[in-house]
Amino acid sequence: MNRPRLSARELARTLASVFAAFKETDALILSHLNRVKIRYKPDGSEVTAADRGAERLLRRHVRAAWPHDALLGEEYGGQLSKQGRCWLLDPIDGTASYVLGMPMFGTLVSLLIDGEPVFGCIRLPALRETTYAARGFGCHLLRDGGRARPVRVAAARALRVARLGLTSFKESDLAAGGGPWHLSRLARATGRIRLVGDCVQYALVCRGILDAAIDPLMKPWDIGALAICVLEAGGSVSDLNGAHHALVERRSLVAASSPLLRRAICRAVSPPASQRG
């Protein structure tokens, strides 16, 4: 069975529309940087006027180009459709870094067809670069003012020498009494840990700077763009249980340069059998 994908013409149109949206969202997001007013969602996570304004801009561009497509965004909701076309929007992935004035945040846009990611962009406004991918077309890095170039994950490495990106330890070992994911055990098993965080670390996996990246807490609007970019760069993705099916509906993500490394990471973070429910 043929898996869904965009045609070359559809991809060109999609890139033109999404890149036009990024010009507007970049300007808004960067205009608020270092003078952010923070509000808190019911789950305790930060949200800013830039988050909401940027998502409104993204929605406007998607609706103008594809008025009949389904749409789900972090700030204004929607429905995750498993049939037909569905856009996933995260206006600022890494708001915790953004509110501190740190440049390690990004805008995520992805397109699902029949529940599968077929297109995704990781836009890093402060770094002025975009990692983008479409099924069957590979993964590319485009720096503002330059030309897009294909990128690939690093050569396969064993876990003991791997370079691993992580957002935080707090979501696992320091929360909920040490579970469910044992990131401290993973840190001891791997070669080098860098607390890069959020979408930036997955962009670095795509170009072979990091060997792997993980996040224990994820949403569909996070996973869609990150997964297709890593896959098209030649990497391997799953949730932390090792599951691939319906990945955008999972609650965690691990991306690695090879299936062997990804499976080793999943084993390292999993609780002992005696602690599993």
Q: What role is predicted for each listed range?
A:
Residues K41, E74, V196-D198, L240:
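Conserved beta-strand termini and adjacent loop/short-helix elements that scaffold enzyme active sites
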Residues T25, I29, D51, V62, ...:
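Residue-level signal for inorganic ion chemistry
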Residues M1-A16, A20, W181-R188, Y202-G277:
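Oxyanion/phosphate-interacting regions
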